[in-house]
Regions:
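Glycine-centered flexibility sites
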Residues: 63, 101, 131, 192, ...
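Extracytoplasmic thiol/disulfide redox context detector
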Residues: 1-112, 189, 228-235
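Structural alpha/beta surface segment adjacent to cysteine/selenocysteine redox centers
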Residues: 67, 75-78, 83-162
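C-terminal cap of thioredoxin/glutaredoxin-like
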Residues: 1-32, 162-235
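A generic helix-loop boundary/linker signal
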Residues: 61, 113-114, 126, 151, ...
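Conserved short-loop catalytic and cofactor-binding motifs
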Residues: 59, 111, 124, 145, ...
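Short N-terminal micro-motifs specific to bacterial/archaeal maturation
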Residues: 49, 62, 127, 148, ...
């Protein structure tokens, strides 16, 4: 059973207005590094680095820009089922389809569950401006806490940013509260509304440039159904 948006009673249209969360608040982490590295990194950071190394990223898209098939994923950073998909299914899809240039993955991050989702989304969008969105989100999934317990606070955001080699940490923290970040968050919500997204993860697959179709997942780590949709799109 996947997480339904209605359970959380967060209307997509109201998400942008609900940014009362302190997205731009300073972190209490001492000795903030200028650049991220694997020194004193969060658990899972080396694994994420190996998993994504060499795969091109641009904004919220992972994979070759000439890939013939696109997978669109709607995810919430607090969603435990999204964590299953991202840490169990996605790595296999990266190996089979993304690295060979057959598939690109477009992440559209929603915030159905609560304030931590909002805070994490803003930071992920800021990471996307440095082409590190997938590094950031994968690392958060590796270190995911219990929903709405405050686990995704400024310290977690800062620690995650500091665990991504090469990422400009102060820039990410500053970019979280920019107008560009707010606009992208609103765009994700509008896209989710248009695609009728009511639960996470929601996965759509189709030929690049065409309208993708939703894939019904038997379980959050259902690689087989997603792979079948990719193969069909590849022809």
């Amino acid at each position: 059973m996947l997480i339904a948006a209605g359970i959380v009673v967060v209307a997509l249209a109201a998400v942008g207005a609900a940014l009362g969360v302190a997205l731009s608040g300073g972190s209490s982490k001492a000795n903030l590094p200028a650049r991220g590295s694997l020194v004193d990194a969060l658990p899972g950071a080396p694994d994420v680095q190996r998993e994504l190394e060499g795969i091109p990223q641009r904004g919220n898209v992972l994979g070759s820009p000439s890939a013939p098939v696109t997978l669109v994923e709607y995810v919430d950073l607090q969603c435990p089922y999204c964590r299953q998909f991202e840490t169990e299914a996605l790595p296999e899809l990266l190996t089979r389809y993304v690295r060979p240039g057959k598939l690109e993955v477009e992440a559209r991050i929603v915030a159905f569950i609560g304030p931590d989702s909002e805070r994490g989304r803003a930071a992920a969008i800021a990471a996307a401006r440095q082409s590190k969105l997938f590094n950031f989100t994968q690392l958060l999934y590796f270190n995911q806490g219990v929903e709405n317990t405050g686990w995704l606070d400024d310290d977690m955001v800062t620690s995650a940013a500091a665990s991504i080699p090469g990422l400009d940490v102060p820039r990410l923290l500053s970019d979280r509260s920019s107008a560009t970040t707010d606009e992208q968050a609103s765009a994700f919500d509008s896209q989710a509304n248009a695609d009728g997204v009511t639960e996470t993860p929601t996965i759509l697959v189709g030929k690049s440039g065409a309208t993708p179709r939703q894939v019904t997942l038997a379980s959050p780590d259902d690689v087989q159904s997603v792979a079948a949709a990719i193969q069909a799109a590849l022809g």
